[in-house]
Amino acid sequence: MTKDVINNMSTHMDKTIDALRKEYQRVRTGRASTGLLDEIKVDFYGTPSPINQVATLAVPEPRTITLQPWDAKMIPVIEKAIMNANLGLTPANDGKVIRLNIPPLTEERRKDIVKQLKKLAEDAKVAVRNIRRDAIDELKKQEKDKKISEDDLKRAEKEVQDVTNSHVAKIDEVFVHKEKEVMEV
């Protein structure tokens, strides 16, 4: 009974960490990453499509992203979508390939990005703690309904706290790694 609650809680916490990592991919760090373009939709013959479904994305150099549309007529549409996404990137094309040069970040901008990353990490920690609270509430309900003993409840609460602590540590680890990447010149 308690194992199910703890496994379910752990799965939800893992999803929270995955969501944080995905969110961090979208943050511009001064280094090229195709993750910057994940949320951009392009009008592909009347259908809004993710940019990676209308072009091949590549990172040939640390500060350059290239997009090679499968249909050359899509170049202006893709460029417009990138401009409208307000990423601070200006596309340049040679008729076949679109190039996005990632400008280096200023020290002030790096610090702002780190603040943004810290807030995202704190939000993830709050989500993990809410998941912990829900799990403990479920365990207390089971104890009240006499499905588990008081000793089982105490043991399970300790295990819930241990799992929570390990997930909070993972969030800190993800944050520190991304912070290093952003502050690297």
Swiss-Prot record:
Spans annotated as Disordered: 141-161
Record-level Gene Ontology MF annotations: ribosomal large subunit binding
Keywords: Cytoplasm, Protein biosynthesis
Stretches of the chain forming a coiled coil according to its record: none
Localisation per UniProt entry: Cytoplasm
Gene Ontology biological process: cytoplasmic translational termination
PANTHER family: MITOCHONDRIAL RIBOSOME RECYCLING FACTOR PSEUDO 1 (PTHR20982:SF3), RIBOSOME RECYCLING FACTOR (PTHR20982)
Function summary: Responsible for the release of ribosomes from messenger RNA at the termination of protein biosynthesis. May increase the efficiency of translation by recycling ribosomes from one round of translation to another.
Protein's name according to its UniProt entry: Ribosome-recycling factor
The species this protein was found in: Geotalea uraniireducens (strain Rf4)
UniProt gene name: frr
